[in-house]
Amino acid sequence: PANPQKHYETTAVEILNDFPVLDAFVAGIGTAGTLVGVGRKLKEERPETKVIGVEPIKSAVVSGGQPGKHVIQGIGAGFVPGNYDGNVVDEIIQVTDEDALAYGLKASKENGLFIGISSGTAIAAAYKVAKKLGKGKIVVTLAPDGGEKYLSVEAFLTK
């Protein structure tokens, strides 16, 4: 499909050009286009790079769990997306709603990045991966959404 192919041809190439050393790539499992497209290219060019998917702990369907209600838009839709390819993914990490909100808001407050809850999820997972890999390791993630679409979400506004 076109979605993973475009990420294979563009996003992955940009990441490879910008990071001569890359220990892990982390992306949310929404359509799985970014995760699989980038992951496939990374596995071809740098097979030692870990490719890690992220899903909400309350709807960890790709990991074999049950669908459930959560606040993270864009991922954890309650089904395994057609683009998903488990052969490309080394690990799946689950993130709580609370961590998704906290990391999104932290990026906004401390770094001036008005990102959304899905981006907070990616950052929370990347932080977990970086902590696990240890000092000096390079972990890349993408911020897939902005904060403006969450201005009507009470949990986002009350933190």
Could you say what each language-model-derived stretch is?
Residues 1-2, 30-33, 55-60, 66-67, ...:
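Glycine-rich beta-alpha junction loops
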Residues 1-32, 86, 98-113:
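Active-site/ligand-binding-proximal alpha/beta "capping" segment
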Residues 7, 11, 35-45:
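Short Gly/Thr/Asp-enriched flexible loops that form oxyanion-binding sites at enzyme active sites
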Residues 17, 40, 44, 127-131:
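Short, well-ordered alpha-helices that flank and scaffold nucleotide-derived cofactor binding pockets
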Residues 24, 48, 137-138:
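Residues that mark the start of a beta-strand
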Residues 28-39, 118-126, 150:
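Short glycine/serine/threonine-rich phosphate/pyrophosphate-binding segments
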Residues 44-117, 154-159:
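Active-site/ligand-binding loops adjacent to catalytic centers
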Residues 124-159:
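Phosphate-binding loop/pocket of nucleotide- and phosphate-handling active sites
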